[in-house]
Amino acid sequence: INITDAHITNPKENYIIYSIAKAGLSTLTKSLAKELGPKIRVNAVAPGPILWPEKSNGFDENYRKKVISQTMLKKVGEADDIAKAVEFLLLNAPFITSHTLAVDGGRSFSSD
């Protein structure tokens, strides 16, 4: 299970290197699934707005509210949401491979 980012299809401004790395990891996920299948499944989880450290993230409260307003579930996720997605792909998804699972409260479905 690789951890990518919800912005792999719509990169954020000023995050060029990060975006390149995460997009590459997404392609690696698909390539490895093709190379290692059928014996090994390879998937990725793409976190969206996950609970940020309150004072250390560089985002002001207005930006945080904007992000939440663009999320269908109207909240940020928690690290446990990512862990549960990884667990699902490992233990309960034997017929899923080469997939990137967005764990973003529906934000990737909304427009930025």
Residue spans of the language-model regions?
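Active-site helix of classical SDR
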Residues: A21, T29
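Active-site loop immediately N-terminal to the catalytic Tyr-X3-Lys motif
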Residues: N10-I16, K74
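Active-site segment of SDR-like NAD(P)-dependent oxidoreductases
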Residues: T4-N10, L32, R107
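Alpha-helical segment proximal to the catalytic Tyr-Lys
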Residues: A33-P38
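C-terminal substrate-recognition "lid" of short-chain dehydrogenase/reductases
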Residues: K75-V103, S108
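SDR active-site strand-loop-helix element
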Residues: I1-A6, V45-P47
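A glycine/serine/threonine-rich, flexible loop-to-helix segment
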Residues: P49-Q70, D112
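Conserved SDR Rossmann-fold cofactor-binding beta-strand/turn motif
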Residues: R41-L51, A102-D104
